[in-house]
Regions:
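Oxyanion-binding "anion nests"
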Residues: 214-258
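Charge-rich, low-complexity intrinsically disordered segments
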Residues: 228, 240, 246, 350-361
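Active-site bordering "gate/hinge" segments
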Residues: 1-227
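Dual-mode signal for accessory low-complexity, basic/Gly-rich regions
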Residues: 256-321
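Short, glycine-/Ser/Thr-/acidic-enriched flexible segments
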Residues: 33-34, 98-100, 138, 200, ...
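Short polybasic amphipathic segments
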Residues: 183-186, 245, 255, 337-347
């Protein structure tokens, strides 16, 4: 095992957050060999607690091979072993290594079909297990974005290992205040989006599920999202590039989408099902220890000074009712001087700076 003690601390954090105890059935998915150090530490911790770990190892390159060669029907069918594992497990943990994307864009129709099949598995995960998704940095991704690997790794551990009880209490106070407001407005260059949160609940995410963690989130009212929002630069979804995405909303629905690259995939995702054009989640990053914008959604959505919307499935815990096989988080960086986030009349992000209860302690 790697001698860095932070891997052991991470394993303890995951086991605590998912409630692993004597007799717990723990399903573990791993998607990249570079995540195996984290997997080994966690499997050891599960055994130490008397749990029963079972590991399914795969690789994102296998998914790419499927998109290239499998039939659309096969792509859209949930993987039977993964489905059985979800139904067996009390706890599910996925260790997803940040693999380098393919050199060429994959067929958007086939890629969207694959995401439909995977959406069934992810729905089972949050409905039937206590779960955690862990996005593990790799040297490949560090090279891709031009950042030293040790920098990514240090921010990863800082964003995973924390006194989450204290963090949850602090952000819980902010959520209580936000629950008294009815509207959210996101403003930046070529962005002015208003969302209603009337009757919905803000909740904290503090070490229980996704790691790295640190956000507050709610589910906007389904038919009350209006305006437009842009996402400059490149973001990644299932290994596919989407560049300079712009979405326009009317009465809760995406009515127009443009991008300088990847628009075919965006349009296919929007047609996933009846709920995929609606915003299922509005999130605000709260983790001041993560500062590097990586292009990876699971990490960037935690950065203090960012907001994100998720097209598709809503979290019932927030009062959301939108159903979809899709849950696509898209991160907006508001840390520049034109970035503002208003909840009611108060600015939580003012000219790129987190203010009030959102400001770092």
């Amino acid at each position: 095992m790697n001698t860095d003690p932070r891997w052991i601390s991470l394993a303890t954090q995951i086991a605590n957050g998912t409630g692993v105890t004597d007799g717990s059935k723990v399903g573990i998915f791993v998607t990249d060999v570079q995540a195996m150090t984290a997997v080994e530490a966690f499997v050891t911790e599960v055994y130490r607690r008397g749990g029963i770990p079972q590991v399914i190892a795969s690789d994102e390159r296998f998914d790419r091979a499927a998109v290239e060669h499998a039939s659309v029907d096969v792509l859209a069918t949930p993987a039977p072993l993964e489905e059985a594992a979800m139904r067996w497990a009390d706890v599910h943990v996925s260790f997803r290594g940040m693999a380098s994307p393919p050199k060429e864009q994959q067929d958007p129709v086939r890629l969207a079909a694959q995401r439909r099949g995977k959406g069934v598995i992810s729905t089972l995960r949050w409905q039937e297990t206590r779960w955690s998704l862990v996005r593990v940095p790799t040297s490949e991704w560090a090279e891709l974005i031009g950042v030293p690997y040790e920098t990514l790794l240090d921010e990863f551990f800082a964003g995973c290992i924390a006194d989450w009880g204290t963090v949850a209490a602090r952000w819980g106070r902010l959520c209580e205040e936000l629950n008294t407001e009815d509207t959210v407005r996101i403003v930046s260059d070529d962005t002015d989006l208003t969302l209603s949160t009337r009757g919905r609940t803000w909740i904290t995410f503090a070490g229980e599920a996704n790691l790295p963690d640190g956000e507050i989130a709610t589910a906007p009212v389904d038919d009350a999202v209006d305006g437009h929002i842009t996402f400059p630069g490149t973001l990644w979804f299932a290994g596919a590039r989407v560049t300079d995405l712009r979405l326009e909303f009317e009465r809760g629905l995406v009515v127009n989408a443009t991008a300088s690259e990847g628009i075919e995939l965006v349009n296919e995702l929007l047609e996933t099902d009846g709920g995929s054009r609606r915003v299922g989640e509005l999130g605000v990053g709260t983790n001041a220890k993560i500062t590097t914008f990586t292009g990876d959604l699971l990490i960037d959505e935690k950065i203090l000074g960012t907001v994100h919307i998720a097209l598709g499935r809503a979290y019932p815990a927030c009062g959301g009712v939108n159903e979809s096989a899709l849950h696509w988080d898209i991160v907006k960086d508001l840390r520049g001087p034109s970035g503002y986030l208003y909840v009611g009349e108060q600015a939580l992000i003012d000219g790129g700076r987190a203010t009030g209860l959102l400001a770092p302690a």
